[in-house]
Amino acid sequence: MPRNVPEVNGVYRHGACELWCRAMAHALLKRSGVRRGLGGREGPLKRLRLAVEDFVRTTSESEACESRSAVARSRPGGRKSRKELRKEKRHLRKARRLQRTVGSGSGDQGGNVGLNDGPETRRPPTEVRPTPAKATATPAKASAPSTNTKASAAQPKAKAKGAPGKPGPATATARKRALLAANEEEDREIRKLERCLGLHKRKKKGDGSSVPLSFARDGLDYILGALECGSGGGLYESSEEEEEEKLETGQTVLESDLESNSKESEEDPDWQVLQEDQEDVNSKRRGEAESGTRGNKGTKKVRFAEVVEKSRSSSEDDIEQQESHSVESGEKYIPPRLRNEEVIDVHKKEELDRLKKHVKGLINRLSEPNMASISGQLEELYMAHSRKDMNDTLTTALMDACVTASAMPSRLMMEHVFLVSILHHTVGIEVGACFLEAVVKKFDAIYRDGGEGKELDNLFTMIAHLYNFHVVQSILIFDILKKLVGTFTEKDIELILLMLKNVGFALRKDDALSLKELITEAQTQASGAGNKFQDQNRVRFMLETMLALKNNDLRKIPGYNPEPVEKLKKLQRTLVRNAGSGSETRLRISWDGILNAEQTGRWWIVGSAWSGTPMIDNSHHIQLQKPLAGMASSKMLELARKQRMNTDVRRIIFCTLMTSEDFLDAFEKLLKLGLKDQQEREIVHILMDCCLQEKTYNPFYAFLASKFCDYERRFQMTFQFSIWDKFRDLENLPDTKFSNLVHLLAHLLRTKSLPLSVLKVVEFSELDKPRVHFLRRVLTALLMETEDDDLAVIFSRVSDNPKLGMLREGLKLFIGHFLLKHTQAHQSAEEASLLREKAGLASKSLQGKAILRM
């Protein structure tokens, strides 16, 4: 075939070849002297023309078939380079110029003959289906199946193309080497990207491929199973199946290429001829492909299912091998959820570090002058952060600052504990409770280990100051002292002296009976010790200190100076005046209750099980009640029956009250009964009834009632409700009960056991004669028997509450109109003058604390 015949997409155009042959025949005729109109020699010329046309037709058919198969083998991608396309365009333009030259130089007869025979040359030849080109090699990597897939998908396109000639073995070998080199280059690029991403592969046993460890952690190892060596065929088969489905619907790769190049071929008439021929060929091919596809579709699906099962089994083996590898190497699988928590923990840790630095800086600058500002900043931190984080951070900072191997200065120790008491009253009782638990547990741990440093002294001093600043009640202090007296070593004696020096007189004021029992037990231990101690002076000094506390002799306690504590207490009242933590903020918890908080629950948290622990073992309380009932004499039981004590609980309470030595003894015995909520209220009711039944007023009941009111708020509320019940029935009370009730209420108001707001139920606008008489006697006793400072505090407690406005106005009106109007008639001049002075002080206190200062 001549070289100047144009080629389009690897297929020689039939029309150009035909024109070239006609031009050559016309040139031969001109050389032989043949002219139009010569009829003598027309027969040989006609035979020559037919022979040339037959030769052109057979040659074009055979070469077109060979070119299709050659192109399919030569070009795996199915597309030419830009250089080849430009070369084809040049040949096409040259063929067009030759066609125009031949058409203009030939005669009418020759041109008519050529045009009449044109459709015959465009008749589609008999199709010869070439065999698709097979893959020359199967690379080991996963990119080889994708390359073969592209080659197989390009087969239908290659069938419609021609080639200038059949490529030789050297060309096929070079093409094969180029493909292998491209695959190796692609593998090198993949390995380079994996190194950049840190996806290091792990060696696997057997035929399984390697999967990066990060993919296995993310759960993507089974997804990548389709790309492994054993499952690569699945993708190849699926791509062929998709191609066959496209053949069924008539969408071949060649058609898509023709559609994409339709705009370029609209202006080319020769291209339209080739497109028509190709459509005829494709119509025949579709019919054959439909029958072949229906037969092979089932087998391909079966093969693909086998490949999928194989990939699944291989992925399961990979997972097992990964797990065994992680166990052997000591690695632990971390789920994504836990990895997110690790990231969150990092941010949380950074935030806690900043909080610790801030709190530590405030603690380092702590002193009495800037106590208000530092406590205010800590309150803001409590509002900005969680309570748990702040409690832990503050407790750790204070423990690091105060618990050292050397003795801390007493002033510095008081200031740190004083800060805790301020936050305990302003923020909430959980602040002091958390700090108290940490201190007690630290003290118990060091005490059990037998620490020789001053850590025990510092911790013991902190507990003592927590009691001084009203964070904890005396029950914890007595528990610790009883524990130390029970062991009674030299270190215990030293700690007992330290505690009595700091809080001894406060303990005597709060619970003198328990202090008396403690002193008696200490004397017993000292007498039984004998020559146990090398230094007997220390034991003697401890006993002398205890006796000085018992006798209220301050001179015999060396180094006792209550002024710093009293000064800080006054500052505390200033800072926590408007605190909203409640009226009773002192924690009543025992030593065992704190140490067993893990089992019984932390009582300062709402819903904790601590409140129920004193009544867990009810059998113990029943055993206590029976001996008490048996110890009561028949005379006492008869007296209880006359007082209408018709239940066992009432009889036990009555007998306990009547047989006690003093109010402290009665208080302890009543608490040891372990009564429940409803049974505890019977204590108040029986106490009130016994007090009113006395022929003359007995202060025993008033002091006992004051002790119960200071012990728990629930007793205070029960006394308040009981007194309100008596208010409603004042006109029916006998004179004895009336007088006893006046003295009882005046005592409770004077000792601040009950607030002045207990009178808020009195309607001052509708007072009758019994109520006027009752209020005059109560207020007179309160004003005459109370000191000025205490009187100002009692009346000022109702001045700040807006809900008690009617009570304030009623009291001022009653004092001015009923109390001071007839003072001269019933009292002496001195008493009347003192009463008017106290009444003026009470009226100013009711108006507000600012007026009282002026």
From Swiss-Prot:
One of its GO terms (cellular component) is nucleolus. One of its GO terms (biological process) is hair follicle maturation. Residues 648-764 form the MI domain. SUPFAM superfamilies: ARM repeat (SSF48371). The modification Phosphoserine is found at residues 60, 311, 314-315. It comes from the Eukaryota. Residues 265-280 have a biased composition (Acidic residues). PANTHER family: CELL CYCLE CONTROL PROTEIN CWF22-RELATED (PTHR18034), NUCLEOLAR MIF4G DOMAIN-CONTAINING PROTEIN 1 (PTHR18034:SF4). Plays a role in targeting PPP1CA to the nucleolus. This is Nucleolar MIF4G domain-containing protein 1. The gene is Nom1.
